[in-house]
């Protein structure tokens, strides 16, 4: 005889990826009364959209396109600066290690990298940053500017203005520890593992931009003034490395002319499809 009993599903969902897709999915689930775990390996939410400024043709913020996200008008706020919802727990610097179980009852092991800074103590004063001896290319600015090994969690600033440590480049010299007025820095921090139970998993892992370096005929990374579309976005952004002025990375001068190269990475023997977006944003 067949057993018709159905195991009750966990009323919680894990959303992997805190870009605009993950944020939108998380908000809609949370507004439906479901507990949401929103995880991302980056130290901030927003993904690639955070690097983009105003959208064509109305010059609006891309994050505003998901509003309203709540039935309560007074709860609306700019998602570019942070996310706050009672049913959403944000798990940043976090990756999925293992998934076990079945639909309706998953057990997920998460690994969270240390930030090196106690957020409850950090005031965001920035006293630690100038004394850091390490400078590396800023991933957020696509290498157009540099940052320290200890730097703001969100490059644009947010409601959470705390700092984090890049342990891949930190020398553990302790200069930031001595400078911190609130004893918020812990250089000896270790990764943390956590197991959560969820009924479903949403994969909103986003995309990775094509690496144009192997296409040597275009001179990307060989010539400083050959840049990608995302790098141009950062140059044109008011909060970018040139404060919105289109300047050549080589000498900081305004270019007299600009050439757009389309279909880099597509329409090749390896990728014979059309990129579908580059013509639009070039125009």
Regions of interest found by a model, annotated:
Residues 70-71, 215-220, 269-281:
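Glycine- and acidic-residue-enriched helix-capping/strand-helix junction motifs
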Residues 25-33, 191, 235-255:
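Short amphipathic alpha-helices and their capping/turn segments at secondary-structure boundaries
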Residues 224-237:
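Central beta-strand plus flanking loop segment that forms part of the substrate or channel wall
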Residues 2-5, 42-75, 91-121, 133-171, ...:
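Non-heme iron-sulfur electron-transfer modules
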Residues 12-37:
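N-terminal Rossmann-like FAD-binding beta1-loop-alpha1 element of flavoenzymes
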Residues 5-21, 257-261, 265-272:
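Beta1/beta-strand and adjacent pyrophosphate-binding region of the FAD-binding site
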Residues 78-89:
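A structural motif corresponding to the C-terminal end of an alpha-helix
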């Amino acid at each position: 005889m067949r057993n018709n009993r159905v195991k009750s599903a966990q009323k919680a969902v894990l959303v992997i990826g805190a870009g605009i897709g993950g944020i939108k999915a998380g908000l809609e689930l949370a507004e439906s009364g479901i507990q949401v775990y929103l995880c991302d390996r980056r130290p901030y939410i927003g993904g690639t959209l955070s690097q983009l400024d105003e959208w064509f043709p109305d010059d609006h913020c891309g994050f505003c396109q998901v509003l309203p996200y709540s039935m309560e008008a007074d709860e609306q706020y700019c998602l570019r600066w942070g996310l706050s919802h009672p049913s959403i727990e944000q798990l940043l610097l976090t990756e999925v290690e293992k998934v076990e179980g079945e639909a309706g009852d998953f057990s997920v092991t998460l690994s969270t990298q240390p930030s090196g800074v106690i957020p409850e103590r950090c005031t965001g004063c920035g006293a630690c940053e100038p004394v850091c001896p390490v400078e590396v290319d800023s991933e957020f600015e696509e290498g157009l500017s540099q940052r320290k090994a200890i730097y703001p969690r969100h490059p644009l600033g947010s409601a959470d203005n705390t700092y984090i440590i890049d342990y891949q480049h930190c020398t553990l010299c302790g200069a930031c520890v001595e400078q911190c007025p609130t004893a918020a820095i812990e250089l000896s921090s270790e990764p943390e593992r956590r197991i959560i139970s969820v009924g479903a998993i949403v994969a909103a892992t986003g995309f990775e931009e094509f690496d144009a370096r192997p296409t040597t005929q275009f001179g990307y990374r060989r010539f400083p003034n050959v840049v990608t579309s995302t790098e141009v976005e950062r140059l044109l952004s008011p909060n970018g490395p040139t404060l919105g002025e289109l300047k050549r990375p080589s000498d900081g001068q305004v270019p007299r002319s600009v050439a757009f190269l389309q279909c880099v990475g597509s329409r090749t023997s390896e990728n014979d499809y059309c990129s579908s977006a580059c013509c639009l944003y070039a125009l």
